[in-house]
Amino acid sequence: MGLIAMSERDLQRIEVLSKVIDGRMTMVSAAHVLGLSTRQVRRLLDRISAGGAASIRHKAIGRPSNNRICDGVRDYAMAIVRERYADFGPTLAAEKLAELDGLTVSRETLRQWMADAGLWLSRKQRRTFHQPRLRREAYGELVQIDGSEHRWFEDRGDPCSLLVFIDDATGKLMQLRFVRSESAFTYFEALELYLKAHGAPVAFYSDKHSVFRVAKKDAKGGQGMTQFGRALCELNIEILCANSSQAKGRVERMNRTLQDRLIKDLRLEGICGMDDGNAFLPRFMERYNRQFAITPARSDDLHRPLNLAPDRLRDVLCKREQRYVGAQLTFSFERQRIMLEENEVTRGLVGRYVETHAYADGRLDVRWKGHSLPYRVFDKDQRVTHAAIIENKRLSDVLAYIKERQDERPAPKVRTNSEKNGYTPRGRKPGKRTDFMNDPVVIARRRQALSNLDAAE
């Protein structure tokens, strides 16, 4: 007799029933141990005495399931799938088989059939593998930058974004900065700190965020370059955009590391806001780099000195745009109407373009050939436009701004239909109001009417 496969349950039953047969255990105790009734234990004992221990095994083992779909139905269904639905997913293919072909098969059964036939790959099998990119050889040759929106202060503070600058060759944290959201101004602030601390690298490596890249290929304004890209061009720094998040995997993995390590350090330090967090970040970077930074393949430092005065650097790290001056010496800027003060210089600027310099602290400078022009804000409206297109990375900041503006406005008053039609209540005439219920004339008329009613009856 060959080997017989048994489950753990069957082996336990044989062991307990053997003790009953040998007289070492009662039938009631065996039923309690096996979780069966005494009658079922008696049946199992009869089965052992008739067919041996092998008869304890479940009778359905080795037999096809009673609910098994026959091979003919399977072959017919797969023939239809190969012919018409080869590129369908199992869910959609099962729906179309039932709707168009009158063949009802569960989606999971069809999924297994299609997988066995090679028509469907599981999510794990479809996973694409990205070939790792070797590190750059020199320090300062390539710096990856990214922003990570997260609850960095957990429940102690509001969520914000962390701007991360990491050197590709060494894995060193070059610059960290807590900001409300990713924008050109916040990246200008982080870039200024980076340049003052390390100098100018060869290139930055980023994603396709609108801060770094103009999405429209045929953009007419700005020579197809963002404000951040224009500033880097003036500083002789290249900006490269990754085609996928996997391409800049080092900064993406660094974001996950910081979301673990940095959050716990902030909790231990009791830090609850961005200002205290930014003051703590230099100490965190120093400790992290000392522990995890690696030695590059080449010892060269490719950072270059800026050789720029602080005022000149601030003029580079700002938003610069051209604005057309109208006949009234006015132009539009950020939903504001700017009016130039009339003087000998501004009188000749009608029909010309002036240059606006917008700084991160809210200052606005209007220039003509490098000279500042006096102006005043004629009309100011900073409301977010209705149905404005907002990027996902700026959504939290914009919603906070909208909530602040809504709280400042008075609650809208809902007008009635009469008010919408122009009706105004005239009010009651002055004097004491007549009590018609106790008026003698009214009482006499009521009594006369009742008497007439009685006479008619």
Swiss-Prot record:
Residues 128-313 form the Integrase catalytic domain. Residues 406-440 are annotated as: Disordered. GO terms for molecular function: DNA binding. Keywords: DNA recombination, DNA-binding, Plasmid, Transposable element, Transposition. The keyword DNA-binding applies. GO terms for biological process: DNA integration; DNA recombination; transposition. This is Putative transposase y4bF.
